[in-house]
Amino acid sequence: DLELLSLHVDGQAYRHFELHAKELVLHDLPSAFDLEITCSNNPLQNTSLMGLYVSSGNFFTQCEAEGFRKITYFLDQPDVLTLFTVKLTAAKKDYPILLSNGNLIQEEELSDDRHSATWEDPFPKPSYLFAIVTGKLAVLEKIITTQSGKEKLLQIWVEEKDLSKT
């Protein structure tokens, strides 16, 4: 279940909306705008394996085909493309790995044994491709060469017990 905490349009609190059981309807919007929606949900109680959920102590998202609407209010359809910037913050002991789509642009060590990672995806995507994975994971890494000759780092993240399966 989603709980709307705040809604901002172009950096200003926005009050021209209706909140219904399964939708948020915005009114009187400019033709172009930046929208920021802050909401809360409970992934620990999400047993549908859709949206944001917990499995084996790790957080995962499964957004295809309609899971993103369990994470936040959104036009959750494949023709709506969005640039996602995601900041994940967690207790480092419990969630040492913080992953999302795109490029890792910032990592921070915070007080009280917490840390954060900010990911920026430079390519517009439909919401069903949004991804978050956090937890205690192991990585298999390999440098690969693309057809154009560029070297890229390939990483496959799994639970430690599954590393030999990769």
Which role fits each region the language model picked out?
Residues 2-55, 112-113, 118:
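A surface-exposed beta-strand-loop module
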